[in-house]
Amino acid sequence: MTSKVGAVATKTYREKLGPEILEVFDKSYKSFTDVQVLAGTHLLNLSDVVVESPTGSGKTLAFVLPMMRMIQNARLQPNEIGALILSPSRELCSQIVNVIKPFAEKMKLNVETVTGGQKVDKNIKMFKNKDINILVATPGRLFQIIQHEKTMIARAMKGVQLLVIDEADRFNEIQFEDHMREILSCIPKQRRTGLFSATQVKEEDDLMVFGLRNAKQVKVSQERNSAAPSTLKNYFVECPADEKTSVCLEFIRQRTDKKVLIFFPSCNSVRYFHKIFERCLTKRPLFAVHGKCSNPHRAAQIKAFSESTNGVMISTDVMARGIDITDIDWVIQYDLPKHSSWFVHRAGRTARCGRDGNALILIATEQLAYVSFLDNHEKVKLEEVKVPTSTSRKAEELRQKMIKIQVSDRAILELGTRAFVSHIESYAKHDCHLICSLDDLNVVGLANSYALLRLPKMRELAQRKDLNQFDRSDIETSEIKYADPKLEANRDTVMKEKHEKKIETLAAKEKKRREKEARKMKRAGGRFKSRATGANAEEKRAKKRKSEEEDDAQNDIRLLKKIKRGKLSKKEIKDVL
């Protein structure tokens, strides 16, 4: 349904919630949003719901309020779980718990989380020792716990009144389906289920995975049925692939007083560009989070970014959903998201709670069709902007600066290569490959935007004919050292072991060749027959070759002994090899 909720419906909903819940609500919130009234009314009428509502519209309270009332009515035992909320990331779980806590404290209920980043044994111990009334979990971690203690979990969840799937469009990906089936097997079938997302769960079969029955559809839409808030303005900038990094930096520099969130396609990309940007944006607070950060580090970085006035956060999609930082001015997407629906979630980190916000995506020339694709499939219109301060000359100057940064530390050099590889792997899997295929991507330009010194060999690029256009650097990468002395010492050891292994392999091959030739000589009676110059001449040539090869083998063995005794320097080893 698409409507504005009237005063009568809102009043009726308030009456259903009861005084305890309203007391907490009225202290912190001014009024109900449409999605809260519509979804909450259906849930309290004991109907399943599928809710599609824009980011920043109050979806969390849309299930928290009716959930608290349902648990209140159920009169749970102290050790019974009355509600299970599944969310795709630990940050979202943490944020949901923060919304629930004031209501839970008022009603003397205990809310707990189980997410990745914690030990499974610790989670199991919590189930055994604590009375849990509301559980907020990532499906992957809850699945792991069920694998260890299914009977215990099923017993704890026998009183579940409500199952909530937050960011439901993420859960119809293949990796979640097995987890969901196992989780659903542990909770009662006679329960209510709510699916909540900013974008549509597109297939009917997806609803079957979650066990919904005769679900009510709630759709609170903005203009043109867009999933984005009306206060959000979406832009794109067209630029050559090799100027993307320059355009990104110049755009940020023009907005010195703005808080900016930048999305990159992989953990390695975030780590690499954090190293680059901290040397290029020296006057701005810079933060970075990705899926492989530790929980304390991620929490500290998000908190510091939230408290900054003009900070720049570099992130993967861990920041794309549910992270409620209300004053982000600009969201920048360095490249296309893996799924077009994720564009909406990324952009939705700005323009929250009625504030104005802006989102920008960097589009390479060969990716221009994506603008129409977004309009047709996600109902998102993009307006073009220019970044006049970014030029090809500045892009080349930046590339040279990035090369110097890599030369200063081998760790950054290797990180840049891994970041580029993961970027290509991610691009090969996005959902609009028919209009923006990897075959059409300017790979050489993208490599230059990463300032690569060497183009790595990749299976995804094996058939490309244009890679010879890449201008390989004259810098000898093997001479670049780690800034960390421990890493450099370890590299020396590894290189020495490789040299030794190579010489040992050569010696073994030579020994095998000599043995084979000896057997051949024996079978021929000690003489080779020659078609051209006669047996005697051929025999002399064979003996000469054998003598030379034996000398080479002996030299290799002597060299190996010198290396093992440490009598050769690194340069002498390299020159000999």
From Swiss-Prot:
Primary enzyme class: hydrolase
GO cellular component: nucleolus; P granule
Protein name per the record: Probable ATP-dependent RNA helicase DDX55 homolog
InterPro entries, per the entry: DEAD/DEAH_box_helicase_dom, Helicase_ATP-bd, Helicase_C-like, P-loop_NTPase, RNA-helicase_DEAD-box_CS, SPB4-like_CTE
Sequence similarity: Belongs to the DEAD box helicase family. DDX55/SPB4 subfamily.
Organism: Caenorhabditis briggsae
Annotated ranges, domain Helicase C-terminal: 231-393
Isomerase among keywords: no
Biological role stated in the UniProt entry: Probable ATP-binding RNA helicase.
Region feature Disordered, mapped onto this chain: 508-577
Domain notes: The Q motif is unique to and characteristic of the DEAD box family of RNA helicases and controls ATP binding and hydrolysis.
Gene Ontology molecular-function annotations: ATP binding; ATP hydrolysis activity; RNA binding; RNA helicase activity
PROSITE patterns with a match to the protein in the record: DEAD_ATP_HELICASE, HELICASE_ATP_BIND_1, HELICASE_CTER
Keywords: ATP-binding, Helicase, Hydrolase, Nucleotide-binding, RNA-binding
EC number(s) on file: 3.6.4.13
Binding-site positions, ATP: S53, P54, T55, G56, S57, G58, K59, T60
Residue ranges constituting the Helicase ATP-binding domain according to the UniProt record: 40-218
Motif (Q motif): 7-37
Motif (DEAD box): 166-169
